[in-house]
A protein has these predicted regions:
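Amphipathic alpha-helical repeat scaffolds
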Residues: 16-23, 146-152
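Mobile, glycine- and charge-enriched loop segments
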Residues: 1-15
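S-adenosyl-L-methionine/SAH cofactor-binding core of RNA-modifying enzymes
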Residues: 48-125, 166
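Structured adenosyl-cofactor binding patch, chiefly the S-adenosyl-L-methionine
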Residues: 30-31, 129-173
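Conserved small/polar residues in nucleotide/adenosyl-binding loops
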Residues: 242-244
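Internal, active-site/partner-interface "lid" segment
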Residues: 164-199
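Short internal beta-strands
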Residues: 34-41
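Amphipathic alpha-helical segments that form the core helices of the histone-fold
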Residues: 210-223, 234-235
Length: 244
């Protein structure tokens, strides 16, 4: 797969079917994925069923990383995409079709770690989990039955990414280093602490306000330099408050 990212990670959240996990491991081999990550699996991902389905993708099962929290699984990632089967989220400006999202993703000159998150077989990803992503995407299907099988969704997404990577883009590539998920998360903690300190955030309204601010930062495709500037401003304000 010709690509402008050095590490592609497929992340499954609480998968409950070993056959699906095995099929996804096989797909990782088909599409040159670098790593399979699983968050709080609800089945035996190393079962005979999973291994039989994985075929040449067995190494992805054997070396997959398991996390107890989705946030931790994306800390080292520069760009995070999340699959969403719900049609109502298209009201958000960070939502798009799988084809559009992958074309947008590949408009960046260099991405060190790209993650694609897929939700639970029965209910997908929660709203709070979707907010961890820079962008969410939907695979267009019939409105009468929009939900896809997990492994089918993964196969279509990886195919779309592969197809996008082989296109010739006319637009100029965006040349800057994206901030990692951990850098953004750490900056949010500092900003949240400051906003509580100055009285902008209150306990009963803080979650809603900080979620909107996180959305704003994630949709902006923030660079490492921009995050460092933001953290520098927060640090300087904190120093000034000490002397008031």
């Amino acid at each position: 797969m010709g690509k402008n990212f050095s590490n592609l990670k497929v992340i499954l959240v609480e998968p409950s079917g070993p056959l699906n996990v095995g099929s996804v491991a096989r797909l990782c081999s088909n599409f040159e994925v670098d790593e399979l990550r699983i968050v709080s699996p609800k089945c035996d991902i190393f079962s005979l069923e999973a291994r039989k389905m994985s075929l040449k993708g067995k190494k992805f099962l054997e070396h997959c990383k398991i996390f107890d929290d989705l946030q931790k699984s994306i800390f080292d990632c520069d760009l995070v995409l999340a699959s969403c089967g719900r049609i109502d989220v298209n009201k958000n400006s960070f939502f798009g079709s799988s084809e559009d999202i992958f074309d947008w993703t590949l408009s960046f000159n260099k991405i060190n770690n790209l993650a694609i998150i897929f939700g639970r077989e029965d209910r997908g990803l929660t709203n709070s989990e979707l907010l961890l992503a820079n962008k969410t995407f939907n695979i267009p299907t019939s409105q009468n039955n929009p939900s896809l099988n997990l492994s089918h969704a993964v196969s279509i997404a990886l195919y779309e990414l592969n197809k996008s990577s082989k296109r010739n883009f006319d637009q100029e590539l965006k040349v800057f280093n994206l901030a990692s998920s951990k850098q953004i998360h750490d900056s949010f903690l500092e900003i949240e602490e400051l906003l509580f300190k100055v009285g902008y955030l209150l306990k009963h309204t803080s979650n809603a306000k900080i979620s909107k601010f996180k959305n704003f930062i994630l949709k902006a495709n923030t660079s490492m330099h921009e995050i460092n500037v933001l953290r520098g401003i927060v640090h300087q304000i904190n120093l000034s408050l000490i002397h008031i």
